[in-house]
Amino acid sequence: MSYTGRYVPTNPKKYKGNPTTIYYRSLWERKFMVYCDKNPRILEWGSEEIIIPYLLPTDGKVHRYFPDFYIKVKRSDNKIRKMIIEVKPEKYTKPPKKPKRETKSFIKDVYEWGRNQAKWKHAREYCRDRNMDFLILTEKHLMPQYKSVSYTHLRAHET
């Protein structure tokens, strides 16, 4: 089941973009929005506000990638770091396992894997050119054991 909705920030001045048009496409995205909105170390954040062009190898055309999040973080050493964050279920961060029979579902998964790899390659280049970091966060980072929020992967970049 997919959970989508509109997010209303409690700190709209921190939001880079129009704070009245923030939408989440999963509860993980919403959880990360709350984290960005309420965390004092997050100085600025945006959701799908950056556009990164990427070449999709399957059709040879340039497409537009809207990463889930942009954040500007004040690290514990008081240095500022900018990051682009993609929130994905862990199963989509690994190549699909080939079944005994090639199904339509498997073919679709292979296509999506290829598309994601192209997007993430261009996102890494985009970030490298701008002295930023690119991170992919999964449910293991956002909801370990489904008990509480743990952003240890993100905190590693805050120090």
Task: Give names to the regions the model predicted.
Residues 27, 31, 64-65, 80, ...:
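Short, well-structured alpha-helical interface segments that form or flank functional binding sites
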Residues 68, 86, 158:
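Acidic active-site catalytic centers that drive phospho-/nucleotidyl reactions
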Residues 87-147:
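Catalytic cores of nucleic-acid endonucleases
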